[in-house]
Amino acid sequence: MQRVIVLVVVALALVGLGWILWGPKGKAGLDPAQGARFALGSEGAPVTVVDFSNYLCGHCQNHALNVLPRLKAEYIDTGKVRYLFRDFPFPGQANVIRASEAAACAADQGRYYDYHEVLFRAASSWGNLEGSVLDRYLVDLAGQMGLDENAFAQCLASGKHRQGVLADQKLATDLGLTGTPTFFIAGEKRTGFLSYEEWKNLLDKALAEKK
């Protein structure tokens, strides 16, 4: 029995070593903020946050609906933080890629953040849709927000923002990211949901270091 236990421990150690040696790793020298297409806040803000999210991720939804509005009011709108959004659809999530394209089409009409929030609120309604049914739903959402539906539908049908979404996805992979949400807060990587209090501590510390 003792020999079996030792063998199991050794096997687990080897698995762990394999993960360390061959698991996902970020490529050196990559800037998570470089080329970000969507942002809130002043370009001159002392602290930058980069948010890699997925529209069907529950923790991302919790952050977007319950934490981000408070961060926006306290840190972003007051010029302390610049907040960058990046898409991180997982393999096989064609509907998340399409939703991300739709958010970019909303950005063309100046409403990225609003549509971003609505996608999270309505995730349970569109999460199982695909193809033309999904497109119709995404266009209807835009219309409910007062966007130009025809322009939005043409944008979505053109696929002109698809490469931007896929570029974000590739960057996330190249950075070695394995889960959502993942945040880079003044360059420091954090993965998983953070409460507002945790955000406040991290941002206040980062701001203090900039003084």
Describe each PLM feature range.
Residues W19-A28:
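Hydrophobic single-pass membrane-insertion segments
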Residues K27-D31, C60-A64, H161-Q163:
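A short linear-motif detector with a strong N-terminal bias
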Residues M1-I20, G35, F52-N54, L65-L68, ...:
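C-terminal cap of thioredoxin/glutaredoxin-like
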Residues A45, V50-G143, A153, T173-T178, ...:
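Structural alpha/beta surface segment adjacent to cysteine/selenocysteine redox centers
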Residues A28-D31, D135, W199:
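Periplasmic c-type cytochrome electron-transfer domains
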